[in-house]
Amino acid sequence: DEFAQHEIFDEAAGRAESDWLVKTGDAQVEFWNTLLNGMFQEVVQIKDSQTLEAYKNTVDAVIIPAVADLQYTIPLHTNIKIYEIWMKYRFKMVSLEDVHGNENGDLSIKPDQYFADWTMTAYGKTPTAFLQSDEEAVNLAAVVALRDAGANFATSFSRVPDIAAWMAEGLQPPPAEATDIQRLEND
C-alpha cells in the first residue's frame, strides 16, 4: 500500500548537506485511523480481497487517501531556524462495488470510478529551540502538519460538493452521470 509506505528521499546536493529520508507512512496510517474512527460510526481497512468480501454489504463508501506531494525545509536551506513540512493530500471516494479484488489478492479500482475526488493541504513548522536534533525537529513539524490535516479534513469533509451530494442522497453514491455533471460544474 503506497500510503502506508509513504516516504520521501532527498539526496544531498553538496558536501555540506546530508541525505534526508522522511518516512510518514506509519504515522499517516495511525493518525488517519484515529481521525476517521472519531468521525464515522465504523471504519474498516480494506487491504485485500478477503476483507472486501467480508464487508461487501456493510460499507457505505471507501476513502482512498494519497500523499500527492510532500515538501520540507530545514535551516540549512533557508537560513532561518525553523523546520517546515507541507503536505498535499488527494482523496477519492468510491462505492465498495467499484473496488475489485485481483487474483493475487490485491485491490484495484478503475481510475474514473470514484464519485468524489478532492485535494487538501496541510502545513507544520517548528522552531529549532529545545530540540535535540534535526530529525526530531522534522518529526515534530510532521506531527504539526498531521494535526493541521486532521482539522482541515474534519471541518471541510461535508463541504466537498460531491460528498455533500452523497450525504444528501442518503449515503448512496450518485449515478455516474450525475457525478460527471457535478464535476464539470465544479471545474
Locate predicted features.
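Generic structural motif
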Residues: 1-3, 70, 96, 125
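C-terminal/domain-edge helix-coil "capping" segments
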Residues: 81, 95-187
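A structural "domain/chain start" motif
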Residues: 1-35, 155-187
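Surface-exposed short loop/turn segments
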Residues: 48-113
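Short acidic, glycine/proline-rich loop/turn micro-motifs
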Residues: 8-12, 74-78, 127-133
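Surface-exposed patches in mature extracellular/periplasmic domains of secreted proteins
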Residues: 43-52, 161-167
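Short, well-structured alpha-helical interface segments that form or flank functional binding sites
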Residues: 27, 31, 86-88, 140, ...
